[in-house]
C-alpha cells in the first residue's frame, strides 16, 4: 500500500475500462456541460494524420497537468469532482452532526475522516501504532517463524511474497474457492527489476535511497536496508510470472490439495499459514505451482536478518501515509514524484476525503447513490445495454472467420450477459468495524481485518452474484468473466461519457462505446475462454480459435510497433485485452448509432461536423489527457491499458468507417491498407 487505501485482500479478476462517466446535464457546480467543446480542436493538425491532437490539441494546451497530478484527463476531472465536491459535501454534512450512533455508517465516516485530519495526534503517536507488528518481526529467529509472522501480517493487508484471496472457482463459478500466488514487489512488476535502460535503473537507485531514508527516519539500525530490500525483491521478481503470463487463465489455474503444498514447498508450514488466516479448505488454486518451490528455496537460502528487514520495510511502507509527516512526505516523494512525476501532494483535506472513500467506500457510496443517482436513470442505461447486445448479435452473425457452431455458442454467452447499474440492490453491514476519531492506523487495521474476514467467510460457499467489486461513486466500469456480467457504477454515468443534452453521435462515441468495450471483454483473449455460465471452459472449435488467435496476434504486433516514449514501446501482449475491447466497443457503438438512424432524416451538421465525424469526436474527448513521462513509463510497464493517445488513435486505422467519415486518403497516417486492418468483432 503506497497511500492510504483499503486492503480487501482480493485480486479482482475483472476487466475495467479505466474511465469515468454522470447522470445529468450539469456538473457539481450546476454549470452546463457542452456535448463537445469545439475549442478542444486544434486545426494545425489534420484528423487523418493525428486524430488525437486534432480533436484534443486545444484541450491539451489549455489543461496542463496540475502539480498534484501525474495525469490529467476527462476521467481525472470527473474523479476529482465526484470526490472533492460531491463526497466532500456528504462528509461535511455528516461531520456537523452531533451524537452519531456508534457503528452507524455516519459515525464511521465522520470519525475516519477526523482521524486523518488529526495531525497533532498522528505526530504525537509517532511509530507507536505499528509497534506491535515491529515487535513481532523483532522476535523472529528462523524461516518458520518468519513465515508465520508474514501470515499474521497479511490479514491486515501487509504484503509478503505469497498472496491469498477468495473468488469464484473458475471451473465451478457458482462456488467460492481459495486462490494463492505471487506478491511482494514494492515496484509492482518484475520489469522494474530487470530492465537496464537509464530511467529504470534510476528508479531502482531512487528506491534504494528511499528505503534507506525511511529506515533512517524511523531510527532503525538495519545494515544497508535499501540494498537489502532491493536485492531481495530483485531475486523474488525473477521467480515470478510476467504480467503477460498472468493473463492466461488456463496457465494460472492450478488446483492442488492442501497436502500437496507441503510437497511443493517442504520447508514452509502451509497448514499454519492457512489457519492463521482463518482459512478452512482442502484445496488451493495456484497461479504458478513452481513458484512455491522457488520461494521455498529463496527463503531458506536467505539470511534471517534480510528477511526481517524486508518484512519490516513492508510494514513501514504499508502504513507510511498514516504516520507522521516525515514518513508521509518521503513516501510521496518516491511513489508519486519519482515513479509518476507528481510534483506536489494534494491538500490534506482532499487526501482525507480520498482516504475515507478508499476504506469506507461502500457506506459512502450508499449516501452518494441516494443523492446523485435516481433510480429512473437505470432504465435509460438498461436500454443502452440492450441496444449494444442486439448489435453484437448482428455482428456475430456477419463474421466470416467464425463457424456456425462457434457462433451458436457465442450467442448463448451474449444472451446470458447480466448487468448491474448504479449501485448494489443490497448493502453490506459494516457496523462491526470499530472506527475512532483519534487513531488512524488502527482504523486502517480494523477496516482491513473486516475485509479479510468477510472474504474468508465465503470460502466453500456459493457465490453471491449480487456483490459489487466497485463502489457506486467509482468512475469506472468492468466486466467480470466469472459472473459473465458488465457493471456500470453511478459515478461512471456522467459527461463526457453520457450527457443527456448531447446529440446522439457524441453519446454513442462515449457511453455506448464504453458499454460495447465491456461487452467485448467477454470475447477478448481472456474473456473468450469463459463460457456463458462464467466457467473456464472452451466453447470454440479448434479452427475458430486459431482464427481468433491469428487476428489477436496481428493486433498485438500492431501495438508492439507503437513507441510511446523513446525506448518504451507499448506491450501489445499486455494490452491486447483492452485493445480488443476498444476496437470492439467502437465498432459496436458505430453500428448501433447507424441502426438507430435508419429511416430517419440525416442529423444536421453541428459545428460543421456530420454525425459520423462527431461520433469519433465523442470517442476522442473521453480519452483526452496529458501525462508526465514518469507516469507514462510506469503505465507502459505495468498497465494492461494502452496510453490515452493510443487508445484514441490506435483502433481508428482499422476502421474503414473512420476513413470514410473524415475522407482520408490511402497515404494518410490514420489509414491502413485493407489487408493490414484487423477486424475481430
List each model region and its residues:
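Bacterial Sec-dependent N-terminal signal peptides
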Residues: 1-30
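Short, Gly/Pro- and small/polar-rich lid/capping loops
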Residues: 29-39
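Hydrophobic/aromatic-rich, well-ordered segments within soluble, folded domains that form packed cores
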Residues: 40-61, 197-216, 576, 583-588
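Active-site-surrounding "flap" and adjacent substrate/cofactor-binding loops of secreted or lumenal enzymes
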Residues: 46-49, 54-121
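Short, solvent-exposed loop/turn and secondary-structure capping segments
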Residues: 57, 62-66, 164-165, 189-191, ...
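Short, glycine/acidic-rich hinge or "gate" loops at secondary-structure transitions
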Residues: 69, 101-108, 219-229, 245-250, ...
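Intrinsically disordered, low-complexity linker/terminal regions across diverse proteins
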Residues: 264-268, 285-289, 346-349, 353, ...
Amino acid at each position: 500500500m503506497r497511500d492510504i487505501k483499503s486492503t480487501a485482500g482480493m485480486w479482482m479478476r475483472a476487466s475495467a475500462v479505466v474511465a469515468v462517466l454522470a447522470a445529468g446535464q450539469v456538473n457539481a457546480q450546476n454549470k452546463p456541460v457542452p456535448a463537445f467543446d469545439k475549442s478542444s480542436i486544434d486545426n494545425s493538425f489534420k484528423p487523418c494524420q493525428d486524430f488525437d491532437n486534432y480533436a484534443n490539441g486545444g484541450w491539451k494546451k489549455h489543461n496542463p497537468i496540475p502539480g498534484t497530478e501525474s495525469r490529467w484527463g476527462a476521467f481525472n476531472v470527473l474523479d476529482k469532482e465526484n470526490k472533492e465536491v460531491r463526497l466532500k459535501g456528504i462528509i461535511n454534512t455528516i461531520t456537523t452532526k452531533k451524537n452519531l450512533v456508534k457503528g452507524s455508517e455516519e459515525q464511521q465516516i465522520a470519525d475516519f475522516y477526523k482521524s486523518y485530519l488529526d495531525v497533532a495526534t498522528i505526530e504525537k503517536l509517532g511509530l507507536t501504532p505499528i509497534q506491535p507488528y515491529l515487535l513481532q518481526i523483532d522476535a523472529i529467529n528462523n524461516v518458520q517463524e518468519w513465515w508465520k509472522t508474514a501470515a499474521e501480517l497479511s490479514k491486515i493487508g501487509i504484503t509478503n511474497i505469497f498472496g491469498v484471496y477468495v473468488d469464484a472457482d473458475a471451473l465451478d463459478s457458482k462456488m467460492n474457492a481459495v486462490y494463492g500466488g505471487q506478491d511482494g514487489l514494492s515496484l509492482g512488476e518484475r520489469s522494474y527489476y530487470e530492465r537496464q535502460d537509464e530511467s529504470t535503473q534510476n528508479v531502482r537507485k531512487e528506491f534504494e535511497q528511499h528505503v534507506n531514508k525511511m529506515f533512517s527516519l524511523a531510527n532503525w539500525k538495519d545494515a544497508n536496508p535499501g540494498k537489502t530490500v532491493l536485492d531481495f525483491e530483485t531475486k523474488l521478481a525473477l521467480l515470478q510470472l510476467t504480467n503477460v503470463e498472468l493473463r492466461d487463465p488456463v496457465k494460472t489455474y492450478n488446483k492442488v490439495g492442501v497436502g500437496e503444498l507441503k510437497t511443493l514447498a517442504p520447508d514452509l508450514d502451509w497448514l499454519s499459514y492457512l489457519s492463521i488466516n482463518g482459512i478452512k479448505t482442502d484445496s488451493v488454486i495456484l497461479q504458478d505451482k513452481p513458484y512455491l518451490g522457488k520461494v521455498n528455496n529463496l527463503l531458506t537460502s536467505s539470511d534471517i536478518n534480510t528477511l526481517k528487514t524486508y518484512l519490516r520495510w513492508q510494514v513501514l511502507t504499508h502504513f507510511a501515509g498514516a504516520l507522521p509527516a516525515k514518513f508521509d512526505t518521503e513516501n510521496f516523494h518516491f511513489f508519486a514524484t519519482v515513479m509518476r512525476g507528481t510534483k506536489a501532494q494534494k491538500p490534506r483535506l482532499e487526501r482525507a476525503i480520498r482516504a475515507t472513500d478508499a476504506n469506507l467506500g461502500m457506506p459512502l457510496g450508499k449516501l452518494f447513490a441516494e443523492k446523485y443517482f435516481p433510480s429512473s436513470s437505470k432504465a435509460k442505461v438498461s436500454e443502452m445495454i440492450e441496444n449494444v447486445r442486439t448489435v453484437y448479435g448482428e455482428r456475430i452473425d456477419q463474421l466470416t472467420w467464425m463457424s456456425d457452431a462457434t457462433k451458436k455458442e457465442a450467442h448463448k454467452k451474449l444472451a446470458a450477459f447480466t448487468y448491474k447499474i448504479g449501485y448494489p440492490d443490497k448493502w453490506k453491514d459494516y457496523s462491526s468495524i470499530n472506527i475512532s476519531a483519534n487513531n488512524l492506523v488502527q482504523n486502517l487495521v480494523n477496516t482491513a481485518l473486516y475485509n479479510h474476514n468477510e472474504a474468508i467467510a465465503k470460502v466453500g460457499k456459493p457465490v453471491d452474484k449480487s456483490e459489487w467489486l466497485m463502489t457506486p461513486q467509482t468512475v469506472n466500469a468492468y466486466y467480470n468473466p466469472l459472473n459473465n456480467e458488465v457493471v456500470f457504477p453511478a459515478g461512471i454515468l456522467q459527461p463526457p461519457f453520457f450527457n443527456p443534452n448531447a446529440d446522439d453521435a457524441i453519446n454513442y462515441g462515449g457511453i455506448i462505446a464504453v458499454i460495447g468495450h465491456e461487452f467485448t471483454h467477454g470475447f477478448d483473449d481472456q474473456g473468450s475462454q469463459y463460457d456463458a455460465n462464467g466457467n473456464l471452459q472452451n466453447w470454440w472449435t479448434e479452427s475458430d480459435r486459431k482464427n481468433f488467435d491469428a487476428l489477436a496476434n496481428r493486433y498485438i504486433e500492431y501495438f508492439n510497433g507503437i513507441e510511446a516514449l523513446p525506448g518504451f514501446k507499448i506491450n501489445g501482449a499486455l494490452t491486447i485485452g483492452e485493445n480488443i475491447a476498444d476496437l470492439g466497443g467502437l465498432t459496436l457503438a458505430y453500428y448501433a448509432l447507424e441502426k438507430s438512424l435508419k429511416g430517419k432524416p440525416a442529423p444536421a451538421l453541428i459545428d460543421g461536423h456530420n454525425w459520423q465525424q462527431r461520433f469519433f469526436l465523442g470517442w476522442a474527448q473521453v480519452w483526452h489527457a496529458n501525462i508526465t513521462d514518469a507516469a507514462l513509463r510506469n503505465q507502459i510497464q505495468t498497465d494492461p491499458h494502452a496510453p490515452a493517445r493510443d487508445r484514441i488513435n490506435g483502433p481508428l486505422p482499422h476502421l474503414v468507417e473512420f476513413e470514410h467519415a473524415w475522407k482520408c486518403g490511402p497515404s494518410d497516417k490514420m489509414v491502413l491498407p485493407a489487408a493490414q486492418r484487423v477486424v475481430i468483432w
